[in-house]
């Protein structure tokens, strides 16, 4: 391993984990609180017979739960990724790593291990890689395949985070040409491609463009969970970038709420992951009723991961129990049945959906 100071990218990854753990970076307002599943008093199913498994990008998961892309790119994150991956394997759910740009561009064995550890810890789990759309424009297909090979990935997520980049002191704000770059990767990559937001969600129009580009899944990552604008505001404050700090604070609440984004994306694509402020198995159930294939969570796993694999497993089993209970009291023996269950929209989410539908 080279004897050198941490790179700017490594420092940024370490900052992100620290800020998310220590600071108030929740935006709130997922809209899931406005979703009411209709109770079935005669569910006509045995609780123990409820099947939470789903098909997902050519594989089968034991439950429609995804550990969302969080970290990697700094030696300090290796243990976190190890715990997350091992827990995903033990519980039969999917997991993504954070952006692999550092692993591709830095000659550092410690950085590389922060990614490769996931496949070592989870030989049979569904794992997906992660690159930014801005990087796809710079990388040829062979380089993108290296990201897949790095963790023997089952899929690749391409993240869109241009609000974060606009606030980030060292951000890349050239958003031109991303869709053609995504299409090129979709056409040539050896594994399925998921396009995901990073806390600001997708509107239907963007989801339609992605569906037309042939992406295999859309991860909404809507407004309501971790606000990366807020995270970058803390980083900007730390380096005295006061203007970017103010912009970051101003846009903390920006985006399409998770519930709305899930509805709009599910109308355009048949494989949607609902994430962004998803915190419980009931939230997952609501998202599936809105049309999602699965629900994704990130921050709720961060503290358990610091304690080790078993703490993450316990959190996942809690989610599974909450989801199974929601399926039971809606009379949904399978996840496909849950997708068809009745729900009611209330409050601001109903207003948002009605206005967007006009």
UniProtKB/Swiss-Prot annotation:
Per UniProt, FMN binds at 69-71, 99, 130, 196, 226, 277-279, 298-299
Cofactor names from the entry are: FMN; NADPH; Mg(2+)
Under the heading Pfam families, the entry gives: FMN_dh
Query: Cross-referenced CDD domains, in alphabetical order?
Result: IDI-2_FMN
SMART domains named among the record's database cross-references: IMPDH
Listed A to Z, the keywords are:
Cytoplasm, Flavoprotein, FMN, Isomerase, Isoprene biosynthesis, Magnesium, Metal-binding, NADP
Which reactions fall under this protein's catalytic activity?
Answer: isopentenyl diphosphate = dimethylallyl diphosphate
Question: What Enzyme Commission number(s) appear in the record?
Answer: 5.3.3.2
GO CC annotation: cytoplasm
Biological process according to GO: isoprenoid biosynthetic process
Q: Which residues bind Mg(2+)?
A: 165
Q: Which InterPro entries match?
A: Aldolase_TIM, FMN-dep_DH, IPdP_isomerase
Report residues binding substrate. 12-13, 99-101, 164
Q: Which family does it belong to?
A: Belongs to the IPP isomerase type 2 family.
Q: What does this protein do?
A: Involved in the biosynthesis of isoprenoids. Catalyzes the 1,3-allylic rearrangement of the homoallylic substrate isopentenyl (IPP) to its allylic isomer, dimethylallyl diphosphate (DMAPP).
Quaternary structure and interacting proteins, as annotated = Homooctamer. Dimer of tetramers.
Entry-linked PANTHER family: ISOPENTENYL-DIPHOSPHATE DELTA-ISOMERASE (PTHR43665:SF1)
Annotated protein name in UniProt: Isopentenyl-diphosphate delta-isomerase
- Recorded source organism is Natronomonas pharaonis (strain ATCC 35678 / DSM 2160 / CIP 103997 / JCM 8858 / NBRC 14720 / NCIMB 2260 / Gabara) (Halobacterium pharaonis)
Q: Which gene encodes it?
A: fni
């Amino acid at each position: 391993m080279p004897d050198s100071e941490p790179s700017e990218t490594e420092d940024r990854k370490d900052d992100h984990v620290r800020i998310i753990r220590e600071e108030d970076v929740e935006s709130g307002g997922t809209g899931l609180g406005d979703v009411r599943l209709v109770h079935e008093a005669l569910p006509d199913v045995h609780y123990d017979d409820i099947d939470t498994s789903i098909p997902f990008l050519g594989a089968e998961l034991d439950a429609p739960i995804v550990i969302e892309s969080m970290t990697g790119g700094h030696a300090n994150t290796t243990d976190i990724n190890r715990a997350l991956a091992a827990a995903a394997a033990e519980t039969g759910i999917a997991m993504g790593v954070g952006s692999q740009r550092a692993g591709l561009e830095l000659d550092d064995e410690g950085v590389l291990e922060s990614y490769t550890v996931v496949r070592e810890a989870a030989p049979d789990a569904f794992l997906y890689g992660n690159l930014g759309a801005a990087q796809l424009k710079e990388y040829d297909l062979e380089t993108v395949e290296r990201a897949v090979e790095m963790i023997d990935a089952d899929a690749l997520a391409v993240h869109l985070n241009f609000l974060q980049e606009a606030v980030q002191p060292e951000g890349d704000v050239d958003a031109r040409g991303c869709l053609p770059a995504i299409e090129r990767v979709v056409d040539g990559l050896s594994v399925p491609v998921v396009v995901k937001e990073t806390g600001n969600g997708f509107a239907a129009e963007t989801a339609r463009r992605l569906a037309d580009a042939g992406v295999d899944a859309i991860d909404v990552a809507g407004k309501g969970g971790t606000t990366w604008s807020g995270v970058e505001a803390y980083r900007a404050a730390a380096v005295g970038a006061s203007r970017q700090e103010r912009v970051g604070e101003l846009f903390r609440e920006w985006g399409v709420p998770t519930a709305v984004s899930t509805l709009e994306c599910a109308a355009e694509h048949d494989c949607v992951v609902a994430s962004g402020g998803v915190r419980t198995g009931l939230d997952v159930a609501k998202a599936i009723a809105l049309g999602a294939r699965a629900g994704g969570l990130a921050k709720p796993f961060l503290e358990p991961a610091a304690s080790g694999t078993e703490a993450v497993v316990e959190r996942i089993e809690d989610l599974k129990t909450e989801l199974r209970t929601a399926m039971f009291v809606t009379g949904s023996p399978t996840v496909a049945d849950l997708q068809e269950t009745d729900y009611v929209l209330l409050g601001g989410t109903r207003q948002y959906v009605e206005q967007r539908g006009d």
